[in-house]
From Swiss-Prot:
Organism: Mesorhizobium japonicum (strain LMG 29417 / CECT 9101 / MAFF 303099)
Pfam families, per the entry: FliE (PF02049)
Name of the molecule in the record: Flagellar hook-basal body complex protein FliE
GO cellular component assignments: bacterial-type flagellum basal body
Lineage: Bacteria, Pseudomonadati, Pseudomonadota, Alphaproteobacteria, Hyphomicrobiales
Keywords: Bacterial flagellum
UniProt-recorded Gene Ontology molecular function terms: cytoskeletal motor activity; structural molecule activity
Length: 107
């Protein structure tokens, strides 16, 4: 599965742009007392949100097996988890690509 760009991940309209939600939603706005979050914190928060989305999909799937959730809830949760995972993979691929590009640079 190759993802050409984060913007291409609009799998389900109405759920919001997961890539934007993961990145922008986890970063606090800079204020005079707060210089903003570091890149590591932003990535950590995005990863945590991705894990939470995947765990939610798993919980909804288990609820459906018990008869406590309908099919629509399962589909929404699984599609959201798929979109979050694809976004995480795309970000990982870009980070690895950037690292390899920097490592090939001449000094």
């Amino acid at each position: 599965m190759i993802v050409n760009g984060i913007g291409a991940l609009n799998l389900k309209p109405g759920l919001g742009d997961t890539a934007t939600d993961l990145i922008q939603g986890g970063v606090a706005p800079a204020t005079s007392g707060n210089l903003g979050t570091s890149f590591a914190e932003a990535v950590s928060q995005a990863a945590s949100k991705t894990v939470n989305t995947l765990q939610n999909a798993e919980q909804v799937s288990l609820q459906a097996l018990k008869g406590d959730a309908d099919t629509r809830q399962v589909v929404d949760a699984v599609m959201s988890a798929q979109q979050a995972l694809q976004t995480a993979v795309a970000i990982r691929d870009k980070v690895v690509s950037a690292y390899l590009e920097v490592s090939r640079m001449g000094i």
